[in-house]
Amino acid sequence: MAATSTRGNPSLGDIFRSVGVLAGVIAAIALVFNLLNDPEPRLPGPVDYQPALAVAREEYGYPVLAPEPVPDGWRATSVDFAQEETGDLWKLGFLIGEGDAFVGLEQTDGEIQSYRDDRLADFAAEGESTIDGVTWERLLEDDDQPDRALVRVDGGAITIVRGTVSYEELEEFVRLLR
């Protein structure tokens, strides 16, 4: 024999009250979620890359580059360096202005062709840039909002400068590398 409710069938008012309680709980959860989540994307804060740069320059077997001086309105937001079995890696990233553009610098003396193929898989050659008498390969990403890159292999290391800016702006950045 099946158990039966002592109250019998719920009335229409009971159903409305139950739905109202559930709607209130869902609304409270949504309100808390919206208050805790900032609708504006937060840009990364600036980082001081000088200590990492000093270590990399002392430890690595190739000239580790960084811009000197950093252009006005540019801020370093990422730095990464690692000594790995495959080679020494140096990365430095900058946001420009309000963060709508970036420029990144990558260097390694590891497996150069493999690193290049991995980092620039969706890029196609677009010619060359000559900067202070040095030739850099121009590459353009195959994307709706393509990155551009300047690439150079020298002294057993590859240097990749890429970003969402024009080739001319990338060239100006390269001129600042020391």
Model features per residue range: what roles?
Residues S18, A28, E106-D109, D117, ...:
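Functionally constrained cores in energy, signaling, and assembly domains
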Residues M1-G73:
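Charge-rich, low-complexity N-terminal segments
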Residues F16-V19, V25-I26, V32, V70, ...:
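Generic hydrophobic secondary-structure signal
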Residues S11, D48, E111, S166-E169:
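Helix N-cap and loop-to-helix transition residues
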Residues P10, A52, A56, G87, ...:
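Generic, low-specificity signal for short hydrophobic/alpha-helical stretches with a mild N-terminal bias
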